Amino acid sequence: MLSVVPSPVLVRAPSKVNLHLGVGDLRPDGYHDLTTVFQALSLGDDLRISPASALTVKVNGEGAAEVPTDRTNLVWKAAVRLAHLVGRAPLVEIVIDKGIPVAGGMAGGSADAAAALVGLNELWDMGLGRDELSALAAELGSDVPFALHGGTALGTGRGERLLPVLSRNTFHWVLAFAKGGLSTPAVFAELDRLREHGDPPRLGDPQALMQALASGDPAQLAPLLGNDLQAAAVSLKPELRRTLRAGVTAGALAGLVSGSGPTCAFLCESADAAVAVAAELAGAGVARSVRTASGPVPGARVIDPES
């Protein structure tokens, strides 16, 4: 009897921007308590997952050489974890086409891990629900559960405990990618250092920001955007100050460093305004490249190869 080889599965993984990122003091276990509001954005990575004779991970696109393709990659770990759960060997090839900047503060690695869970669940016909996949996602990393769910959400703990947040509009963003990345642990360590030597401003409660999201008004949302890690990212990469100024000068409503950086995200009034801001930023020479994106969008999901 002939066995049927499953067709490859294509999965889209969204990037994210932290609209609010409040960072608590360093805990004894080396982590920080976070209060964050995530929004999933249309800029994303695509993963193609196919049956193979051995587990392999391949990466294409800008920054591909900086992404490990061995067992240290979160995608590799996701495949091994899911295969172990069902008692099978992880015999798949996973090809990642990068759209999310590497080490850019937009959770590209976490998004890819979430996409791997979704794609393998489909390829292997496991029938796992989102809650079961979420539990696996939380074991892989604190940003992976949000990449799985997408939309807009409030994250607490290390960011892995999620509550959906009502967002009544599509918000339009311009993303300025910096030359070179920033290490997330290095940015947190720099924040700890800055706090030891002074008292950089800390964000308060995100309630007003969540009300602005529910209103759907970007002008109401703009002044409420904030990131406790921004001071540390700018301290390590001072040229980000110029990028942030340039985006607002170009017409953005507000700008902030995304997550641990160094990508800068600019909220705009409309899709047309975002195109205009992106064009001006691209000509200003303050970023390696510039993209537009919108959100919120769904989390990691299987897509039609033709889409």
Swiss-Prot record:
InterPro entries: GHMP_kinase_C_dom, GHMP_kinase_C_sf, GHMP_kinase_N_dom, IspE, Ribosomal_Su5_D2-typ_SF, Ribsml_uS5_D2-typ_fold_subgr. The keyword Nucleotide-binding applies. SUPFAM superfamilies: GHMP Kinase, C-terminal domain, Ribosomal protein S5 domain 2-like. One of its GO terms (molecular function) is ATP binding. This is 4-diphosphocytidyl-2-C-methyl-D-erythritol kinase. Its EC number is 2.7.1.148. Pfam families: GHMP_kinases_C, GHMP_kinases_N. It comes from Nocardia farcinica (strain IFM 10152). Catalyzes the phosphorylation of the position 2 hydroxy group of 4-diphosphocytidyl-2C-methyl-D-erythritol. ATP binds at residues 101-111. HAMAP family: IspE (MF_00061). The gene is ispE. GO terms for biological process: isopentenyl diphosphate biosynthetic process, methylerythritol 4-phosphate pathway; terpenoid biosynthetic process. Pathway: Isoprenoid biosynthesis; isopentenyl diphosphate biosynthesis via DXP pathway; isopentenyl diphosphate from 1-deoxy-D-xylulose 5-phosphate: step 3/6. Keywords: ATP-binding, Isoprene biosynthesis, Kinase, Nucleotide-binding, Transferase. Gene3D superfamilies: 3.30.230.10, GHMP kinase, C-terminal domain. The keyword DNA-binding does not apply. Belongs to the GHMP kinase family. IspE subfamily. It catalyses: 4-CDP-2-C-methyl-D-erythritol + ATP = 4-CDP-2-C-methyl-D-erythritol 2-phosphate + ADP + H(+). The active site is at 16, 143.
